Amino acid sequence: MSTDATLSFEEAMEKYDPVLGFEVHVELNTKTKMFSSAPNVFGDEPNTNVNEVDLGMPGVLPVVNKTAIESSIKIGLALNCKIAETCRFARKNYFYPDTPKNFQTSQYDEPIAYDGYLDIELSDGTVFRVEIERAHMEEDAGKLTHMGGSAGRIQGADYSLVDYNRSGVPLVEIVTKPIQGAGSRAPELAKAYVAAVREIVKNLGVSDAKMERGNVRCDANVSLRPHGRERFGIRSETKNVNSLRAVEHAVRYEIQRHAAVLDSGEPVIQETRHWHEDTRSTTSGRAKSDADDYRYFPEPDLVPIVASREWVEELRATLPEPPAERRKRLQADWGYSDLEFRDVVNAGVMDEIEETIAAGATATVARKWWMGEIVGRAKNADVDPGQLGVKPETIVELNKMVEAGKINNKMAAEVLDGVLAGEGTPAEIVEKRGLAVVSDDGPLLEAIDAALAAQPDVADKIRGGKVQAIGAIVGGVMKATRGQADAGRVRELILERLGVEG
């Protein structure tokens, strides 16, 4: 049987128990790189933020970025980890074009933080504890871009380009212990865990935490074992999954794939795999290496790091409000019900709503736009809401137009679609598409007269006191004006025309 065949998720859950493990890589937002003075800036021209240390030129020596160490300690504390009094760097040796030194400076058996945990709240309020094995410091690799072939993949590419701007960017890798007992909620837990880590590092201010930029990337490990068996199965590792939705889908897919392999009687291969968003599937990468294959040894050019207890406590005192407490405060500040706030958190738009309120919207308006308009569009596009790129200022501008009577809610939704299509600002789109509300009563009265003439029975009902029947007339006027009338003003004019009190 092909290792890419799958069973249904329900069939897999009937037979097997999933065991998960995650390695989340967090890029730190320091001004310079981990071991060099080269700038740590996203989006610059390729190979412009590189120096001789990043390229491993002969005779150069690395210098540790103190801010990166402090950020790493803060992450460890926020994950309820113990902070090592002494830790050291190690060389992880492998040969790949994105690693010009032919080794990555990382940490092996002496990480800076270890033995922590994170309590994860699922969509129904269930709390699941994920134990943290370690959080260690390392440097990022460069970025390869595969040219030609299919969708930028290495398979079938004509050649590859390498950008070393990312080489040497400081990373913290957070590694969980095996996660057992999630059962059919494993995909949901995967998404919620990565979301919680992202929220923590963003809250700490140590990372921009934008998954679409690769600031937070997840390697998801999955294995299956028959129900009742203690021994773990063979695992696969899906590399560099870079959205919350993709993490959930990748774990679900791998559970189904493993189940199909095991049902066929074939062994699961221990390997890395690549996630493809377009097909929602993984493909084989390479056989998974053990630590011995990397020939780790202590970095001879860097002395051990000593994190005194005084230093650690000073950093602990600077930690911001924990995310769980922040959520409680925001819910109280915004006046959302438990259900409303849980929906906001589950939709992943809490930060966006907070930013929209800070830009000038009320809590009610911000929730209306994000939950009522943007979340649905994100689902249709199969992306996370934040990936749509809607700015808080755009929401505020749109809502002001509605409140001022320049456009109605239907037009505002059309303008939002224009913004997402890159047509410009809300004001520019309104002008280009001719979406202004009809404010002249003359054309409205003409449309009202036509609608009343077309539905005399409805007009009689309204005159007779059944004012609720007015909706049919309003609908006719809105259709005649192509939705460009103010429904409230139309209602007023209809009642005036019929001599009925509102």
Swiss-Prot record:
An example molecular function term from Gene Ontology annotations: asparaginyl-tRNA synthase (glutamine-hydrolyzing) activity
SUPFAM superfamilies: GatB/YqeY motif (SSF89095), Glutamine synthetase/guanido kinase (SSF55931)
Enzyme Commission number(s) from the entry: 6.3.5.-
Record-linked SMART domains: GatB_Yqey
Catalysis: reaction(s): L-glutamyl-tRNA(Gln) + L-glutamine + ATP + H2O = L-glutaminyl-tRNA(Gln) + L-glutamate + ADP + phosphate + H(+); L-aspartyl-tRNA(Asn) + L-glutamine + ATP + H2O = L-asparaginyl-tRNA(Asn) + L-glutamate + ADP + phosphate + 2 H(+)
Pfam families with a match to the protein in the record: GatB_N, GatB_Yqey
Keywords of this entry: ATP-binding, Ligase, Nucleotide-binding, Protein biosynthesis
Transmembrane residue ranges: none
Gene Ontology biological process terms from the UniProt entry: glutaminyl-tRNAGln biosynthesis via transamidation; translation
Family in the record: Belongs to the GatB/GatE family. GatB subfamily.
HAMAP family (alphabetical): GatB
Function: Allows the formation of correctly charged Asn-tRNA(Asn) or Gln-tRNA(Gln) through the transamidation of misacylated Asp-tRNA(Asn) or Glu-tRNA(Gln) in organisms which lack either or both of asparaginyl-tRNA or glutaminyl-tRNA synthetases. The reaction takes place in the presence of glutamine and ATP through an activated phospho-Asp-tRNA(Asn) or phospho-Glu-tRNA(Gln).
Quaternary state and interactors: Heterotrimer of A, B and C subunits.
Protein name, per record: Aspartyl/glutamyl-tRNA(Asn/Gln) amidotransferase subunit B
Lineage of producing organism: Bacteria, Bacillati, Actinomycetota, Actinomycetes, Micrococcales
Gene that produces this protein: gatB
